[in-house]
């Protein structure tokens, strides 16, 4: 099983970007992998993890905590390593890191059309909640 450790920009960025492009695709500029990574590491919160085997990055997870709720983002597993328990290990690692900060509840979002990912999260204890997710892009003119 790969080891899970904190993301290290100098050694990990190229592989993480490639993994995310392979797993997520990306259709919008605000989700561009290099931008997302730069913004995350600028927070310096220690909640960005990678799963590494030898020198290969096989998975990622980012978490966030605002003092009230925790969030999971960018959970990605190399397609050749799916169904190996790696996704569950990444989520549990982030859950522990959030719990260590005092977090009592974790949220996440996914597309309602992504049935396989929804089934994965349900299998590890997450449930659909009666909420409406809303968002707004903030432009430089704000």
Tell where the protein language model's regions lie, with residue ranges.
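A conserved beta-turn-beta hairpin within the catalytic core of GNAT-like acetyltransferases
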Residues: 64-73, 82, 129-130
């Amino acid at each position: 099983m790969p080891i899970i450790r904190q993301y290290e920009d100098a050694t990990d960025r190229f592989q993480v970007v490639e993994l995310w492009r392979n797993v997520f695709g990306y259709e919008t500029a605000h989700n561009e992998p290099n931008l997302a990574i730069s913004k995350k590491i600028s927070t310096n919160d220690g909640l960005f993890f990678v799963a590494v085997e030898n020198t290969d990055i096989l998975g990622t997870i980012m978490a966030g905590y605002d003092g009230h709720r925790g969030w999971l983002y960018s959970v990605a597993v190399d397609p050749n390593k799916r169904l190996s328990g790696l996704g569950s290990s990444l989520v549990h690692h982030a859950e522990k890191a959030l719990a260590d900060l005092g977090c009592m509840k974790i949220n996440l979002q996914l597309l309602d059309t992504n049935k396989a990912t929804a089934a994965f999260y349900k299998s590890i204890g997450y449930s659909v909640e009666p909420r409406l997710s809303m968002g707004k892009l903030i432009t430089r003119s704000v």
